């Protein structure tokens, strides 16, 4: 993950704050907008032809270690060490709008520009085709998504496109206050997406994982011939 820089009073609003990922509660319906985008204009708002932006990673969960991100360079060795196959996940950023349990928008909170939450969402890549089908029929930049959680433990959802888009209602409003709310949502979501890699898990070396598992960590060894040693000493004039 990239290192970010900041100073007192500048870009330090989220320092020390723990990001809360979106997780559904069984029996509850949510209304969400996709708020990270593939392209932005000079004004910082999503470009006309922008689509929702996603990230992806393979990871393995191991009790006592957590979620470990794997890639092509260590996949085979990590799977052997953790005795599990890696799974593919995708991530994006949602604006979860204030609603009742049935997913009906809290209009009063919406009018006040309050009650929404900007949250990263990590889901199994097996669910991505469901999102793609919804997007193909009703593009997300112009429509919201209604999601009913049928199983909070396994994060199973029934997903249906919603005809409105709450984010666009803010951005396209003639009311400058609403426009500013929309702009602030986009700006915050962009920062969250820039750091979404950390939401997938931890980047660890093989030795890091061995140490977390309480196993012996390999130590680097090297052998130097007597001729090489003499040459090194000669170079040092010893």
Show which residues each predicted segment covers.
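OB-fold ssDNA-binding interfaces and closely related basic DNA-contact patches used
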Residues: 1-137, 191, 195-225, 238
């Amino acid at each position: 993950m990239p290192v970010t820089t900041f100073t007192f009073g500048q870009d330090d609003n989220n320092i020390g704050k723990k990001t809360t990922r979106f997780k559904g509660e069984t029996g509850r319906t949510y209304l969400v907008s996709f708020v990270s985008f593939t392209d932005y204009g000079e004004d910082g708002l999503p470009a006309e032809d922008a689509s929702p932006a996603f990230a992806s990673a393979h990871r393995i969960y191991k009790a006592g270690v957590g979620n470990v991100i794997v890639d092509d360079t260590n996949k085979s060795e990590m799977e052997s060490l953790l005795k599990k196959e890696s799974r593919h996940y995708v991530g994006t950023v949602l604006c979860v709008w204030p609603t009742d349990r049935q997913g009906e928008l809290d209009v009063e909170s919406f009018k006040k520009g309050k009650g929404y939450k900007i949250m990263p969402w990590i889901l199994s890549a097996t669910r991505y085709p469901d999102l793609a089908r919804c997007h193909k029929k009703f593009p997300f930049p112009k429509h919201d998504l209604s999601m009913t959680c049928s199983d909070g433990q396994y994060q199973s959802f029934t997903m249906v496109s919603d005809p409105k888009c709450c984010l666009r209602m803010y951005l396209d409003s003639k009311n400058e206050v609403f426009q500013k709310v929309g702009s602030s949502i986009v700006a915050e979501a962009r920062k969250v997406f820039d750091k979404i890699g950390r939401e997938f898990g931890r980047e660890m070396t093989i030795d890091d994982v061995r140490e977390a598992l309480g196993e012996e960590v390999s130590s680097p060894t090297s052998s130097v011939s007597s001729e090489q040693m003499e040459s090194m000493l000669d170079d040092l004039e010893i």
